[in-house]
């Protein structure tokens, strides 16, 4: 039986965490830099614990004004401090609630930059490995960040997106474009099933891109996140695909 993880970005102050945590199997917990608060983190951790959901850190650039979605070019020392600060804080809060942090998934611009920039990808992977080599690194399927994680000796989780469209090179369509996001349930479900069952996704130019779907992301800040999660989980199970971390 095929198996796939379902994840969402949480603790970003968007209000849908409790509902999503009854449907997903991995929670990407924001670390109060690009969005959210300590209270949001603690609440998300409590809901995750109640539902047996795997916990990962979701660190981003310290850029609340742009929700961490604007590219930054930090020095290695500044990036190390930025990530260690966020990972350390979440790890401490997890331990305080008797939980374990299992993986790291960078947020927004950091995630997308590292997908295409090998120097940044290597730096991010090295920082995570130095922080805790037992952590896994979640990154875009086929990306340089995924390769860097493997090279750094980390376990990796290859991620695909239910609610984002793809470029022919396998990267995500930039949010600045009007066709960046998938808004209909039907299109999201079809895209998910194609990625999980067939190992490919249709790009915006109609070409097919090979993907490895270890985990499917739904954005927790999206207006359709809960509906997507309900329907996608239902359709995966109906197709004989187990939803599990």
Curated annotation (Swiss-Prot):
Keyword Nucleotide-binding: yes
SUPFAM superfamilies with a match to the protein in the record: Glycoside hydrolase/deacetylase (SSF88713)
InterPro entries, per the entry: Glyco_hydro/deAcase_b/a-brl, LamB/YcsF/PxpA-like
EC primary class: hydrolase
Origin: domain of life: Bacteria
EC number: 3.5.2.9
Catalytic activity: 5-oxo-L-proline + ATP + 2 H2O = L-glutamate + ADP + phosphate + H(+)
Gene Ontology process terms (BP): carbohydrate metabolic process
Keyword Amino-acid biosynthesis tagged: no
The entry's keywords: ATP-binding, Hydrolase, Nucleotide-binding
GO MF entries: 5-oxoprolinase (ATP-hydrolyzing) activity; ATP binding
A Pfam family annotated for this UniProt entry: LamB_YcsF
HAMAP family (UniProt xref): PxpA (MF_00691)
Family of this protein: Belongs to the LamB/PxpA family.
Function per UniProt: Catalyzes the cleavage of 5-oxoproline to form L-glutamate coupled to the hydrolysis of ATP to ADP and inorganic phosphate.
Oligomer and partners: Forms a complex composed of PxpA, PxpB and PxpC.
Protein name: 5-oxoprolinase subunit A
Taxonomic path: Bacteria, Pseudomonadati, Pseudomonadota, Betaproteobacteria, Neisseriales
Name of the gene: pxpA
């Amino acid at each position: 039986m095929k198996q796939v993880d379902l994840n969402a970005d949480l603790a970003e102050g968007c209000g849908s965490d409790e509902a999503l945590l009854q449907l997903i199997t991995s929670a990407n917990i924001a670390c109060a830099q690009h969005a959210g608060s300590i209270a949001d983190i603690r609440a998300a951790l409590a809901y995750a614990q109640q539902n047996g959901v795997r916990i990962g850190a979701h660190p981003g650039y310290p850029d609340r004004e742009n929700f961490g979605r604007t590219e930054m070019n930090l020095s290695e020392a500044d990036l190390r401090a930025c990530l260690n600060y966020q990972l350390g804080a979440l790890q401490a809060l997890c331990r305080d609630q008797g939980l374990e942090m299992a993986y790291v998934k960078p947020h927004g611009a950091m995630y997308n930059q590292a997908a295409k920039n090998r120097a940044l990808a290597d730096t991010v992977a090295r920082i995570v490995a130095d922080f805790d080599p037992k952590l896994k690194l979640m990154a875009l399927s086929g990306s340089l960040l995924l390769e860097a994680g493997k090279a750094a000796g980390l376990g990796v989780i290859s991620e695909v997106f239910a609610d984002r469209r793809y470029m022919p090179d396998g990267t995500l369509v930039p949010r600045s474009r009007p066709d960046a996001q998938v808004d209909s349930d039907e299109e999201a479900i079809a895209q998910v099933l194609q990625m999980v069952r067939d190992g490919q996704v249709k790009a915006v130019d109609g070409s097919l891109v090979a993907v490895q779907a270890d985990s499917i992301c739904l954005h927790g800040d999206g207006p359709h996140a809960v509906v997507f999660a309900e329907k996608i989980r239902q359709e995966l199970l109906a197709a004989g695909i187990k939803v599990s971390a």
